[in-house]
Amino acid sequence: MTHILDDLSFRGLIQQQTDEAGLRELLDKEKISLYSGFDPTADSLHIGHLLPILMLRRFQLAGHRPIALVGGATGLIGDPSGKKAERTLNNEEIVREWSQKIKNQLSRFLDFEAEENPAIMANNYDWIGKMNVIDFLRDVGKNFGINYMLAKDTVSSRIETGISYTEFSYMILQSLDFLNLYRNQECKLQIGGSDQWGNITSGLELIRKSEENAKAFGLTIPLVTKADGTKFGKTEGGAIWLDKEKTSAYEFYQFWINTDDRDVVKYLKYFTFLSKEEIEDLAEKTETAPEKREAQKRLAEEVTVLVHGREAFEQAVNISKALFSGDIKQLTAEEVKVGFKGVPSLEVEKADELPLVEILVQSKLSPSKRQAREDITNGAVYVNGERRTDVADVLTADDRIEGQFTVIRRGKKKYFLLTYK
C-alpha cells in the first residue's frame, strides 16, 4: 500500500510541512488523530472547503482518525487570514445554526461509525465558550509575544489597513484548539490551507511551551488555482456550494465538466480517489484526444457522486444531454426545475389559452408581436425543444411537462419557463 505522504506528494497536495521526516516516522509507527477546522461563515461549505475535507477522508482511509472541528467560537470572531478588511461579525444564534448545518455536511464525507477509526466531530465553542478572560490571558495569552504575532503574515498584511484586537486574537484561539485536541484527543497533526501556516505554527509553539516532550506537526495544502487566472470555485452566479439548495447538483456537475484541459489532471489528483494509474491514463487521453473530454467527464462524475450521490449525478447527466440535444420533452418536471433554475419565468393559469406570439412578447424573448411572428416563421422558436413555425400556434395541455412546465426557446440560447398554477 502506498504511504499516505507519498500519495499526497503525487497528488501535489502538500504545500508546507513543519517536519517531514518526523511526521513520516510517526505515521510509520502508529495510527494518529489529526484535525482540520471549518468556521461557520455561511450556512453551507463550498468547494473551497473540499480539499481539507478530502484530506481528512484520505487519512481516514489510511487508518488514521480524523477530527472535523467546527468553529462555533472562532466563527464568532473571524479569521483575518487572506482578508484585506475586517469581517462583519455574526450573532451567536446564526453561528450556532450554521455550525449545525456544517456538521451535517461533513458527515457525508467522513465515517463516524467506523469500527477502528471513527471520525470525531468537535466544536471549539465547547471549550472556548467556557473560558473566562482571566484564564485566557494568564494561561494562554502569556505564551504569545507581540513581536512574534506581528511577524505572522495574517497580521502583518493587515497592519497598514488596520486590524482589530478581535481578529488579532484569532491566532491565539486557533492555537488553543490545537492544544485542547492534543491534550484530550491525542491529536498530533493539523491540516489547513496555505493561508493557515501562521496559525498552525502558532499552535505548535503553544503545545511546545505547554506540554513536555510534545510531538505535534502541521501540514498545509496548496491554494487551488485555475490556468485562466480566474478564481477557483466562483462562477458568474457566485460561489459553488456543497448544499444542493444553494448550488444544484446539475450546476455543480456543470462546473466540473467545464474544467479547462490545463487544469483537469491537477483536479483529478486533488478532488478524486482515482489511482495514479487511472489518472495517468486520463492524462494521456487528454493529451491525445482532448476533444473527447474523457478526463472532464470522469472528474465531474467522481466529484458529483461524492458530494451529491449517484442518483443526482445521473439526473445532472440527463439534463445536460437533453439541453445539448434539445430534447426537452424527455425530462421530468423535477429535472426541468433543476436544469432551468434561474431562467426567467412566468406563472400562468392552466385554463388560459396561450397564443405563442403573445407568450414570446410577454416573456420579452421577442420585442413585439411583429418580431414574434417573424421569429416563428423563420424557425427560431422552440417549445420543449420542438420547432414551431405556425404563427397561429396556441399552447395546450400537451405542451406541459407533467402538467407543470413549458420551456420556450428563441434562437440558440434564450430560454423562458412557463409554470402553471
Curated annotation (Swiss-Prot):
Protein name as it appears in the record: Tyrosine--tRNA ligase 1
SUPFAM superfamilies on file: Alpha-L RNA-binding motif, Nucleotidylyl transferase
Family: Belongs to the class-I aminoacyl-tRNA synthetase family. TyrS type 1 subfamily.
Short motif ('KMSKS' region): ranges: 231-235
Transmembrane annotation, as ranges: none
Subcellular location: Cytoplasm
Biological role: Catalyzes the attachment of tyrosine to tRNA(Tyr) in a two-step reaction: tyrosine is first activated by ATP to form Tyr-AMP and then transferred to the acceptor end of tRNA(Tyr).
InterPro entries: aa-tRNA-synth_I_CS, aa-tRNA-synth_Ic, Rossmann-like_a/b/a_fold, S4_RNA-bd, S4_RNA-bd_sf, SYY-like_C, Tyr-tRNA-ligase, Tyr-tRNA-ligase_bac-type
Domain S4 RNA-binding residue range list: 354-420
Gene Ontology biological-process annotations: tyrosyl-tRNA aminoacylation
Binding site for ATP: K234
Subunit structure: Homodimer.
EC number, as in UniProt: 6.1.1.1
Residue window of motif 'HIGH' region: 40-49
Reaction catalyzed: tRNA(Tyr) + L-tyrosine + ATP = L-tyrosyl-tRNA(Tyr) + AMP + diphosphate + H(+)
Main enzyme class: ligase
PANTHER family hit by this protein: TYROSINE--TRNA LIGASE, MITOCHONDRIAL, TYROSYL-TRNA SYNTHETASE
Gene Ontology, cellular component aspect: cytosol
Residues annotated as binding L-tyrosine: Y35, Y170, Q174
Highest taxon in the source lineage: Bacteria
The entry's keywords: Aminoacyl-tRNA synthetase, ATP-binding, Cytoplasm, Ligase, Nucleotide-binding, Protein biosynthesis, RNA-binding
Gene Ontology molecular function terms on file: ATP binding; RNA binding; tyrosine-tRNA ligase activity
